A protein has these predicted regions:
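Conserved catalytic core of the tyrosine transesterase superfamily
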Residues: 1-295
Length: 295
């Protein structure tokens, strides 16, 4: 806490206070935000709050925007936030499934019924083909979970083996799939989807929940987590399956522009940032490709 404002209540703060703060005050505030105690106004309980690199970055961005608003309008004379460096953001390692883990996951979803009994077995048998189709589609195309749950029956084209997805921003694009995805989708449509009568308004939805409505994002996230937790300690989400696909495609083709296009990245630099580590592996392996002398 800044001792100069220790006895201030919220109503005591005016715009003039902004001119009193210095860059060192902002730096001390950022340091404070890393770990601090706060008291719940209702329960009066004290708990510890921490902020990650991204949390600190967001708060500093908000503070800069706040100061810029008053500074540009000449309401205040100083902007100390300009003299404080933005918190550094370190790239997170991409979490994805290895090739053997992909096979284990699909095998597990197809056969785990032998380990279940009672109600759990009944639920599994009911949703098995749907779950296999969803996980296979995510792994085989790299589409976002939001794109998957938005698919309609009419979006699937078996003549060209593609699905019409609605990307971020509303643009549409055909994403193509292979034989494994085709087989999983056909099995689902002939079993679970054909056996379920959708509720009114959901007749066109490709993937249905057990409540006969369009399946939701959270339901897919929970389903992926349920199966993946049985074959790996990694925290696997639908987005991690997307990363798994992107990694596999890049390793096979080495074409970052193709990967960016298929994944629906508007900026190829986004793709480059995510798969830079793979580039490093490729460069390292290249060191042994050229032989200076015959052994």
């Amino acid at each position: 806490e800044n001792p100069a404002f220790k006895n201030y209540s919220l109503k005591d703060f005016t715009v003039d206070v902004l001119d009193q703060l210095k860059a060192v005050d902002i730096e001390e505030y950022l340091e404070y935000l890393k770990v601090y105690d706060t008291t719940d106004v209702h329960t009066k309980e004290t708990k510890q709050v921490t902020n990650s690199e991204r949390g600190l970055f967001r708060k500093m961005s908000a503070l800069r925007s706040f100061y810029n608003y008053f500074f540009k309008r000449q309401i205040i004379q100083k902007n100390p936030t300009l003299f404080v460096d933005m918190p550094k953001l370190h790239d997170k390692a991409i979490i994805r499934l290895d090739t053997d883990e992909v096979a284990k996951l699909l095998d597990y979803v197809e056969s785990c019924g032998s380990k279940l009994t009672g109600q759990a077995l009944s639920y599994y048998n009911k949703t098995k083909e749907r779950d296999i189709a969803i996980i296979t589609l995510l792994l085989g195309t790299g589409i976002r979970v939001s794109e998957l749950v938005g698919l309609d029956l009419s979006d699937v084209d078996f003549n060209n083996n593609g699905v019409m997805v609605t990307r971020k921003g509303g643009s549409q694009m055909v994403v193509y799939f292979g034989e494994e995805v085709e087989k999983a989708l056909r099995n689902y449509l002939e079993t679970y989807r054909k056996a379920v009568t959708p509720l009114a308004g959901y007749e066109n939805a490709l993937f249905l929940s057990t409540q006969r409505r369009r399946i939701g994002v959270q339901a897919v996230e929970n389903m992926v987590k349920k199966y993946a937790s049985q074959i790996t300690n990694k925290r696997i989400t639908p987005h991690k399956l997307r990363s798994t696909y992107g990694t596999a495609l890049y390793k096979e083709t080495g074409d970052i522009y193709l990967v960016a296009d298929v994944l629906g990245h508007k900026d190829v630099n986004t793709t480059k940032k995510h798969y830079a580590a793979i580039d490093e592996d490729r460069r390292r392996s290249a060191a042994n490709v050229v032989k200076l002398r015959e052994p």
